[in-house]
């Protein structure tokens, strides 16, 4: 779970548009759908989930 230089743009996207950060990390999977739903329901939960996905994978 080390952070690489490729993770920095993903984190920037995760702060601005959380689904984009998840898409760059996992592609078009159920993780993207969950992130979109969380972002619609509340911006902060979407950011937290996106950062979790980027750190976990």
Swiss-Prot record:
Domain of life of the native organism: Eukaryota
Principal location class: membrane
Keyword Transmembrane helix among UniProt keywords: yes
Source organism: Caenorhabditis elegans
UniProt family annotation: Belongs to the UPF0057 (PMP3) family.
Subcellular localization: Membrane
Pfam families: Pmp3
Record's GO cellular component terms: membrane
Membrane keyword on record: yes
Membrane topology category: Multi-pass membrane protein
Alphabetic keyword roster: Membrane, Transmembrane, Transmembrane helix
Residues that span the membrane, as ranges: 3-23, 36-56
Name of protein: UPF0057 membrane protein T23F2.4
